[in-house]
Amino acid sequence: MSMSDPIADMLTRIRNAQGVQKASVVMPSSKLKAAIAKVLKDEGYVEDFSVQEEGGKAQLTIGLKYYAGRPVIERIERVSKPGLRVYKGRSDIPHVMNGLGVAIISTPQGLMTDRKARATGVGGEVLCYVA
């Protein structure tokens, strides 16, 4: 069975794993998922991530991060969906929780946070919000 929205599946796996205090979560890998994991690591929301080949299929492993027994990621939600894409110009890029969270944006220069997109002066597809 094909997956209609692999990014939503990734975010749901992270949300569910943190809900039961898992140390890490494993999922099928893709270039886009690895790029999202890199942004999450750079922003300090996850410990680390790695991509391994298992039986001809690439698997993405994300090490989850906790502080005082609570997940560092309080909220992670998909914004642009396959049925309703959400694009924002450089002047319309949203602030997540007044700057306390980040929006991950797919731009012509690659994936980046809302802050970096504003600084670079580019817009793009708003993939998800993380807080």
Curated annotation (Swiss-Prot):
<dbReference type="GO" id="GO:0006412">
    <property type="term" value="P:translation"/>
</dbReference>
<keyword id="KW-0689">Ribosomal protein</keyword>
<dbReference type="InterPro" id="IPR000630">
    <property type="entry name" value="Ribosomal_uS8"/>
</dbReference>
<dbReference type="GO" id="GO:0019843">
    <property type="term" value="F:rRNA binding"/>
</dbReference>
<dbReference type="GO" id="GO:0003735">
    <property type="term" value="F:structural constituent of ribosome"/>
</dbReference>
<keyword id="KW-0699">rRNA-binding</keyword>
<keyword id="KW-0687">Ribonucleoprotein</keyword>
<dbReference type="Pfam" id="PF00410">
    <property type="entry name" value="Ribosomal_S8"/>
</dbReference>
<dbReference type="GO" id="GO:0005840">
    <property type="term" value="C:ribosome"/>
</dbReference>
<protein>
    <recommendedName>
        <fullName>Small ribosomal subunit protein uS8</fullName>
    </recommendedName>
</protein>
<dbReference type="GO" id="GO:1990904">
    <property type="term" value="C:ribonucleoprotein complex"/>
</dbReference>
<keyword id="KW-0694">RNA-binding</keyword>
<comment type="similarity">
    <text>Belongs to the universal ribosomal protein uS8 family.</text>
</comment>
<dbReference type="InterPro" id="IPR047863">
    <property type="entry name" value="Ribosomal_uS8_CS"/>
</dbReference>
<comment type="function">
    <text>One of the primary rRNA binding proteins, it binds directly to 16S rRNA central domain where it helps coordinate assembly of the platform of the 30S subunit.</text>
</comment>
<comment type="subunit">
    <text>Part of the 30S ribosomal subunit. Contacts proteins S5 and S12.</text>
</comment>
<dbReference type="InterPro" id="IPR035987">
    <property type="entry name" value="Ribosomal_uS8_sf"/>
</dbReference>
